[in-house]
Amino acid sequence: PEHGQLAVMAKAVRRAKSKLAGGIELFAICELGLVKSSSATNGMWTLTSSRIIVFYDQLMLDYDRLQFGYEAIKQISRLSSAVDTPELCQVLAGVLASLNSRLIDLRLVKTWFSLHLARLKGSELNLLTDSNGMKLVEGVSYDYDIAEQAFVYLDGGGRYDTETIKLLRLLSANPASILARLKIENETVLTNALYLASLAEQSG
């Protein structure tokens, strides 16, 4: 992860007798051996060895989890061309590990991913103050202004309650391992948290 995005050439990796066969999987963390190729290959690296450390095979048994796994990899790959940080790898590994456990609600995984991706993009959701700079108060419901990217206080109350904001704060401040300990039964809270996290991620 400390090297960022690399262009790698894997020769004959799908041949049955290849020493690389079975050592590369999309939904896996692998230990790779790489050598710098000649200038004739435009500075690409050549894969010389590969060993699977963790294989997230269970997520492939569920279509929705599989599709989101593809989407997460695509988004991290796209962002890695602009943002150079090992945390991208950490976020992706956390998402894949969570998707691999069918006991974890998929909406929680999506919410966690969107929140952390938004932070890496520089569009982190403001969960401390409202549009007027006032501290968010427990027991008060707020609306959300997409243009200002901030919660808005209304005299009659808003759509997003304290439980939604608490969940977003918890997910924002913790690694993906926290998801295995959460059981959110309030469907509205889950739906609203995912919506707000998605807004933050899309604005980045």
Positions of predicted regions on the chain:
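Non-catalytic alpha-helical scaffolds and adjoining flexible linkers that form interface surfaces
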Residues: 2-204
